[in-house]
Structure formats: C-alpha cells, structure tokens
Amino acid sequence: MSEIIIRKARREDCEAIRMFIQELADYEKMPDGPKIDYKTLERDGFDGQPLYLCNVATSDEKVIGYTLSYYTYSTWCGKSMYLEDIYVTPDFRRKHVGKKLLKAVAKEAIENDCHKLDFVVLKWNPAQEFYKMYRASDLTSKEQWHCYRFVEEDLKKLASDCE
C-alpha cells in the first residue's frame, strides 16, 4: 500500500470532497440530504474568511478521505471544535486512514486551544466503536443530551415570528 498523506484540503479538492459527502449521505441512508455543490464548498472554504477546516487523506496523490470541522464556542469551557464529517473510501477502511484523519483534527483543536471536540454519530453506525477506541464519550447515554435542529423553513418562520 502506498503511503497515506494527511494534508490541508485545497480548492481543487472540493469536487472530490463533494462526491464523498454524497457517498457518506448514501451510507447514512440520507441520499437526498446534501444540497450544496462543490462551488459552495470552494466559496465557503477558500474565499475570504473560511467557514470550515478540511483535511484530506491521499494515496498516490488521489484523495481517499476527508474531515470537515469548524470552531464553536461553549459557555462551559470556551473555544471548541465540531467535527461535521469524517469519511474514508471503502477500499481504504481498516487501514488506519480514519485514525490519521481523526488525529489531525485533534491536533488542530489542541494547537488552537480548543477544550473539546464534538460530533454526532447515527445510532446504528458501527463507527461508534472506532470513536470509543479513542475514548470518545457517548453523551446521549452518559449525560442524556439530545440533538435538535431547526431546518431552514422553520428557522425562517421562527425569525418572522419575532418581528
């Protein structure tokens, strides 16, 4: 197997990353979930003030996985990071690529004074075992936290109700 290299994503990686976002959504049984295109990824990640951080894993200069994360803030501990996605193509799973990608995110978080890294995993996803190997805590079972979301339509309604 060729050497696996983890590096910061570049603008030209956005088409591959967008394809992987769809592959991840398909795996998560949410194929209609992703609405953005690679141009949006380019704009939001590489124009002006980047809205996210992205690393890619490469083998023979071909992108084989990625992480997408961003900074958040916790009123309990301060600066934090959120891991939106971690994905490795099927041919490279169980070859420590995910570990290398996750370690790169952890390193970025620590180097930037983040106190925690949050993420969500679907209840049925066997990747939970991967995260537990590295001592991630399941906050739903440990602290009874549940994740909620306002989708765009409901967010607009809520905002208009405030006027």
Language model feature labels by segment:
Residues 43-56:
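A short helix-loop-beta-strand connector motif used in the catalytic cores of GNAT acetyltransferases and
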Residues 99, 111, 123-143:
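Conserved active-site alpha-helix within GNAT-family acetyltransferase domains
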Residues 86-93:
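A short, internal acetyl-CoA/4′-phosphopantetheine-binding micro-motif in the GNAT/acyltransferase core
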